Amino acid sequence: MKASMHPLIESHCTQLRSLASSYGLSSIRVFGSMARDDASNLSDVDFLVEGSGPLSGFSLGALLMDAQDLLGRKVDIVTVNSLHPLMRDRVLHESLPI
């Protein structure tokens, strides 16, 4: 059974989905400590994203900055296609849709 996501993410789901949509993303998921709800006050936020088409570095960078402003935390963004093969299964298994 998957754990519930951190309250910080739960309280901003609508805004995060809106941001994702505005940058052409078809999917945004949280993984890592925020998905396991074992994050500390210093934890960053890890997002796994997929686009409905090719994703530009500009779009991903702008999303990263907007998400950091919204959440008040450091944010990391990775695409499904960029996941390292050794991490892929774990990340896909623990990631939670927003």
Segments from the language model and where they lie:
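Catalytic core of pol beta-like nucleotidyltransferases
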Residues: 1-27, 35-41, 52-98
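Conserved histidines in hydrophobic membrane contexts and catalytic metal-binding motifs
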Residues: 30
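Short hydrophobic/aromatic beta-strand micro-patches
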Residues: 48-50
